[in-house]
């Protein structure tokens, strides 16, 4: 399995930007797949034709919602990577910000809502073909949420009816609003979800 990850972008000093990938995400992917080859996707390595799976990782905010240069740079990178993955029909998973970015990319509403940061949320599983459970509990870290839309297939949703896990209709593009890599002990249901997405 060859996996590309788009990194978060942080401003470490005035106009000095750092590209970052959480080491826990890399460890989580090693937990899910046997000897994965992991590539960090940036402007100089945007050719993603040799990967089997693209992850738009967490971190940052959508530039249209939070006007900051680091978000502008991130959104530019993710736009190019997602367009390339769509063209080459590579499966994509957006994690947290990545899920919001994909939703926004397909013109679905993303809006600010309290109660989803550092909180354990109960996610009701609507589509059991992805996970044969009625619900799961996950820790969330996001300020923005996603509303239901005709372009999304809801797979799992929160008790406040906001979407936590979805698939773009007619495409192998998914969004997951929680961070599977942030559990101290990786959860097997997250591994099952990734395997299902890549199958």
Question: Where do the protein language model's features map onto the residues?
Answer:
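N-terminal beta1-alpha1 cap of cysteine-dependent amidohydrolase-like domains
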Residues: 1-97, 105, 111, 118-133, ...
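DNA-recognition element of transcription regulators
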Residues: 140-144
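Catalytic His-Asp charge-relay segment
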Residues: 172-176
């Amino acid at each position: 399995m060859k996996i590309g990850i788009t990194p978060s972008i942080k401003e470490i000093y005035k106009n000095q930007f750092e590209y970052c990938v959480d080491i826990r995400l890399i460890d989580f992917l090693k937990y899910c797949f046997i000897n994965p080859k992991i590539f960090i996707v940036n402007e100089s390595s945007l050719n993603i034709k040799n990967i089997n799976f693209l992850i738009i990782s967490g971190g940052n905010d959508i530039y249209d919602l939070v006007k900051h240069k680091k978000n502008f740079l991130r959104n530019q990178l993710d736009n190019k990577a997602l367009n390339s993955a769509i063209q080459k029909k590579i499966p994509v998973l957006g994690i947290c910000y990545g899920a919001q970015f994909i939703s926004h990319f397909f013109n679905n509403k993303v809006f600010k809502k309290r109660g989803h940061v550092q909180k354990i949320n109960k996610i009701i599983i609507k589509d059991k073909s992805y996970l044969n459970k009625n619900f799961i509990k996950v820790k969330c870290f996001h300020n923005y949420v996603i509303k239901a839309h005709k372009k999304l297939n809801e797979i799992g949703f929160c008790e406040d009816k906001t979407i936590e896990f979805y698939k773009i209709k007619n495409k192998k593009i998914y969004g997951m609003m929680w961070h599977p890599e942030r559990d101290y002990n990786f959860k097997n249901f997250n591994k099952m979800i990734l395997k299902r997405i890549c199958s």
